[in-house]
A protein has these predicted regions:
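A mature extracytoplasmic/lumenal domain signature
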Residues: 33, 104, 125-129, 158-160, ...
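Structural recognition of the beta-strand scaffold that forms the well-ordered cores
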Residues: 28, 100, 120-125, 155, ...
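Active-site-adjacent structural segments surrounding the nucleophilic cysteine of cysteine proteases
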Residues: 1-89, 93, 127-129, 134-138, ...
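A short acidic/basic microdomain associated with nuclease active sites
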Residues: 18-19, 99-102
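...with weaker cross-activation on analogous glycine-rich loops/strands in unrelated enzymes
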Residues: 87-89, 93, 103-126, 130
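Loop/turn elements at helix/coil->beta-strand transitions in domains of secreted/extracellular proteins
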Residues: 94-98, 117-122, 163-165, 192
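Extracytoplasmic/cell-surface-exposed regions of Actinobacterial cell-envelope-associated
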Residues: 79, 83-92, 100, 113, ...
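Noncatalytic regulatory segments and standalone regulatory/sensor domains
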Residues: 136-148, 154-198
Length: 198
């Protein structure tokens, strides 16, 4: 974090209002990140509405469902495929014009054009950019997915190419600039999971 950081004139910064996940959703970073983006598009969601009404849960599956309960500290999380479906469920119910798209596999630099078009991106990283630790796996459709201790999900809402920083709306830390190199390392290590709503 860089509290004294002053962005350059080349910086892009989207007005994504931050929502802190605690105390209601200690493991609900993904649903809070989705809520921030949906609210950016004019939906008026309370902090827990996505988690309570739209998130499908499962005791084992963290890929297409939320493993555990986001209201509980022992909950784990939900990966991009499941979060994309959660967004689609909400948007369909609202008859909203937007569509959710899973961009998993996209390099970080290729997400910047979305920001240029005023489209924030939900991105998976780690809590406070700590090194992810592989703690579980789940197989679905013949593909093995790994779950990591320190798993986290934030909204990428800006970047500063001159100073090599990215702006994130983090449900734990607030709105913060992060060093691009380290952020990219974690993003890549986590499988480059990203979701956009267009």
């Amino acid at each position: 974090e860089y509290p004294d950081f002053v962005p350059s004139s080349q910086a892009v910064s989207l007005p994504v209002e931050n929502i802190l996940q605690n105390p209601e959703l200690p493991t609900g970073c993904e649903s809070v990140a989705l809520t921030m983006v949906l609210n950016y598009y004019g939906h008026r969601l309370a902090k827990t509405e996505i988690a309570d009404r739209y998130l499908l849960k499962d005791p084992e599956n963290f890929v297409t469902r939320f493993k555990g309960d986001p209201h509980d500290i022992s909950g784990d999380g939900i990966y991009a495929p499941g979060l994309t479906e959660t967004a689609r469920r909400f948007l369909s119910e609202q008859n909203a014009p937007q569509k959710a798209t899973d961009l998993t596999g996209t390099p970080l630099s290729e997400l910047y054009p979305y920001l240029d078009r005023k489209i924030p991106v939900i991105v998976y990283d780690s809590v406070y950019l700590k090194t992810p630790v592989d703690v579980a796996e789940y197989v679905t459709d013949g593909e093995t997915w790994h779950f990591y201790h320190n798993e986290h999900c934030i909204v990428l809402c800006g970047y500063d190419p001159l100073n090599r920083r990215v702006l994130v709306s983090d449900a734990l830390s607030g709105l913060v600039w992060r060093e691009e190199r380290r952020f990219t390392e974690i993003y890549d290590a986590r499988g480059r999971m990203a979701v956009v709503i267009l």
